[in-house]
Amino acid sequence: MKQEVILVLDCGATNVRAIAVNRQGKIVARASTPNASDIAMENNTWHQWSLDAILQRFADCCRQINSELTECHIRGIAVTTFGVDGALVDKQGNLLYPIISWKCPRTAAVMDNIERLISAQRLQAISGVGAFSFNTLYKLVWLKENHPQLLERAHAWLFISSLINHRLTGEFTTDITMAGTSQMLDIQQRDFSPQILQATGIPRRLFPRLVEAGEQIGTLQNSAAAMLGLPVGIPVISAGHDTQFALFGAGAEQNEPVLSSGTWEILMVRSAQVDTSLLSQYAGSTCELDSQAGLYNPGMQWLASGVLEWVRKLFWTAETPWQMLIEEARLIAPGADGVKMQCDLLSCQNAGWQGVTLNTTRGHFYRAALEGLTAQLQRNLQMLEKIGHFKASELLLVGGGSRNTLWNQIKANMLDIPVKVLDDAETTVAGAALFGWYGVGEFNSPEEARAQIHYQYRYFYPQTEPEFIEEV
């Protein structure tokens, strides 16, 4: 009997992947190929995506795992992508203008001048989404101001996940989790905001029916099936924005904050309430819609391992193994003998170290950076608790930064709550697959699907006495 799987097509900024996941959340087959944006013809500093190239990359991935897939019964397909990007299309779904990439600087001026249409504070209070130059709203305002005839001609605006879903099924839809990144939703109503659309002159008719995660969009059509080398008629289930599925796929429960630790740290939570009026008071804050109706994902982000990489280059070399830095910092007592670091290297004039003496070593500088970043996390978690009306009892940690066991322990000590680390990197794919299984009727809810997965976490508990932490 063939093994049943959900096939997740994941379009990331650096890689496009096809991954087959079984009912227990185990990966049965996977393939990956690099993804890259193109330089726009109009201006060599502008970036855009080629939809045809992305679809070809998916086809290449599916063909790489074709022999494994022929041994499987593919119950459903789910598509995940990065947020915000999309394109205007005609009635056949043909692009009227290329997909402007989130990396493209052309929309920065629109963001800077948005106050002439609607106040930035009001915008965030309604939509939840922070002021980021790549937001969908700014792309549409840019198109309206520079190519007004395209907005008039357009049948629809499709987010990138919906562009892919349209090519698979022929259906025009809007993934709710993608719309949640757009800065055009009334986040409390889970629908496009008449106030924002009216102020910016964007017609509501451009946005096709909203689909919730786990809802069936349609089935795989002949041309797409031939391109991917898959059987015709496979149900295509709505997923959408990768962040929301990473939260669910990591096992995050309601009111359990999740920290994705990498070059940037992104702190988010799945909360039943959110005070969007507070968001604009905190730089780097945002709020998106959760994968499940009735929940929100408020969050904030800041530069983290990017600071540590700079410290490494400054005192060691860019190639020095991290373990060497960690071992030197372990020898320093908590508090780094009074050396403190203000870690906001991007926007604070007072960034850097204080309390340096003739006895200060490079280990002190690195430990102070770890402690300074953790103090930043502590402040941001307190803000998030206020915004999301919850109290954290533990922190779920994912991403490359979670491999630093000393930093994990410092986090547990300073936050005074357990830190649990999930090593599995495929949280987005896992989350999308769980909604896929729910969508094809295998389970009564995404939670029931998730209950089949055995999560393995490593725990770091607060330590009252300073001690050297053994490698876990």
From Swiss-Prot:
It holds the Pfam family FGGY_C. GO terms for biological process: D-arabinose catabolic process; L-fucose catabolic process; rhamnose catabolic process. Optimum pH is 7.8. It is an enzyme of class 2 (transferase). Catalyzes the phosphorylation of L-fuculose. Can also phosphorylate, with lower efficiency, D-ribulose, D-xylulose and D-fructose. HAMAP family: Fuculokinase. This is L-fuculokinase. The gene is fucK.
